[in-house]
Amino acid sequence: MSWKGFTKALARTPQTLRSKFNVGEITKDPIYEDAGRRFKSLETEAKKLAEDAKKYTDAINGLLNHQIGFADACIEIYKPISGRASDPESYEQEGNAEGIEAAEAYKEIVYDLQKNLASEMDVINTRIVNPTGELLKIVKDVDKLLLKRDHKQLDYDRHRSSFKKLQEKKDKSLKDEKKLYEAETAFEQSSQEYEYYNEMLKEELPKLFALAQSFIAPLFQGFYYMQLNVYYVLYEKMSHCEIQYFDFNTDILESYERRRGDVKDRAEALTITKFKTAKPTYKRPGMGPGGKDATASSSSSFSSKREEAAAEPSSSTATDIPPPYSTPSVAGASDYSTPSAGYQTVQTTTTTTEAAAAQYPQAAFPPPPVMPQPAAAAVTTPVAAPVAAAAAAVPVPPPAPAPAAAPAAEHVVALYDYAAQAAGDLSFHAGDRIEVVSRTDNQNEWWIGRLNGAQGQFPGNYVQLE
């Protein structure tokens, strides 16, 4: 839109709103309004004819192309499986030569149909689609003229309202007289333009309707006979379709059922057609007697591995944690008949204790009394008097290694996806690494973990210990 057109549209805006809401004096011409409605009907009819003709030609061409593609698909299905057989002696010819021949024959018939109907499609485009397109161009030009007439009506009503308002003003100043003269001039000019376009359209639109009617009616009639000719060609070609593979004398459903035989039953009898894959389900405690058994098999291997790891502590754990000071850590196990079970495990696996026992004789180190202090405090606080007296007579053994830092948090890896089923549950996906907050030795129970800042409980048999 040009600047001039924009300013005109802006000046017409108040009058446009008054016209829409029927406020003030609005010019109405019943004869023109009736002609305008007939013109809109003509425009709709012409568009529909052009669209229907175009859709029809596209549908016929698409139908034939689809039939060719269908024949190609049947040929590919009937062909034997390509590739070299692993055992040439057991190779069987699985192709359907008769079916391939029938599909090829049907394909040739469709190709012949395309050639015969190509001329009919060209006739439809030449006599229906193209003339209708020319009519639509004329209709668009006339529509622009109708729009211009409506704009002239808005200008006419606008200038008339302004002129009438200034004319009814009683005490007019020199400035008002000047405005009145300008408004009268604009009103006369807009009145002449409106009358010109309004009278021209009222006179020429009926002539256009008569010409369009004499133009569109033969198009509809010709389009009908063109479709009839297309259907006749299709019927003649397909009725003389002589393909021995098909039995045209019997019902199509009966022929299909006879050819299919018991293929469906044999296919459904195959085991591979009933194979289903699904992840193990887990029932929360207290939901039924079968909840525990349903997931025990999926986690048995992980439970056995975890129990073996618990029965054999690693050397790194034993060396990092020093033995309690209240136990005879530097004496041999053979001189004491009743050492504690925990001391025996630490003594056999701790390299620091064995080195100290080899350096200092057993007779020089009497067993110290059992002290109630914890192991970490016994290393750094003064010892009891008997121990101090014994230590004064012999060289002081090297200090025990400092207590190791707190063990790292335990983590598990998710084996399956789990969605929270109740408030307090922790959702995760397969492969997520979850920090364990609290757990039991039974993987069929619910553990507590933390993932991405969220803490909650989850089934133990859905995860694997790292």
Swiss-Prot record:
The SH3 domain extends over: 407-466
* Compositionally biased spans, kind Low complexity: 294-303
Query: What GO molecular functions are on record for this protein?
Result: protein-membrane adaptor activity
Which residue stretches belong to region Disordered? Answer: 280-342
Q: Name one Pfam family in it.
A: BAR
Q: Which GO terms describe its cellular component?
A: actin cortical patch; actin cytoskeleton; mating projection tip; medial cortex; mitotic actomyosin contractile ring; Rvs161p-Rvs167p complex
Q: Name one GO biological process term.
A: plasma membrane tubulation
Q: Where are the annotated coiled coils located?
A: 31-67, 177-204
Q: Which UniProt keywords apply?
A: Coiled coil, Phosphoprotein, SH3 domain
Q: Ribosomal protein among the record's keywords?
A: no
| Residue(s) carrying Phosphoserine | S298, S299, S301, S303
Stretches assigned to the BAR domain: 17-269
Question: Which parts of the chain span the membrane according to its record?
Answer: none
Spell out the SMART domains in the cross-references. BAR, SH3
What is the protein name stated in its UniProt record?
Protein hob1
> What species does this protein belong to?
Schizosaccharomyces pombe (strain 972 / ATCC 24843)
